[in-house]
Amino acid sequence: MVSQLFEEKAKAVNELPTKPSTDELLELYGLYKQATVGDNDKEKPGIFNMKDRYKWEAWEDLKGKSQEDAEKEYIAYVDNLIAKYSS
């Protein structure tokens, strides 16, 4: 189960004044999924479904990382994005 701070940071991402880059969003996605679900056990999307494939890869890259560590990294990453895009 994720912490209240994690949930607050997940909401804060949507309130950034500037949309993060695609790479930043993929990093967030992977960390979010690893923190909330754990290791990726989904089938890799087909080659013609690039958006879902990139998201799958971002999550797959974190396989083996504990949900707690992923949550901590997600919170720190969001804090960095807030500092970057709110100044």
Swiss-Prot record:
Domain of life according to the entry: Eukaryota
A family per Pfam: ACBP
Residues in ACB domain copies: 2-87
Protein name: Acyl-CoA-binding protein 2
Alphabetized InterPro entries for the sequence: Acyl-CoA-binding_prot_CS, Acyl-CoA-binding_protein, Acyl-CoA-binding_sf, FERM/acyl-CoA-bd_prot_sf
Keyword Transport attributed: yes
Gene for this chain: ACB2
GO biological process, one term: fatty acid metabolic process
Molecular function in Gene Ontology: fatty-acyl-CoA binding
Family: Belongs to the ACBP family.
Residues at which an acyl-CoA binds: Y29, G30, L31, Y32, K33, K51, K55, Y74
Organism: Saccharomyces pastorianus (Lager yeast)
Keywords: Lipid-binding, Transport
Function: Binds medium- and long-chain acyl-CoA esters with very high affinity and may function as an intracellular carrier of acyl-CoA esters.
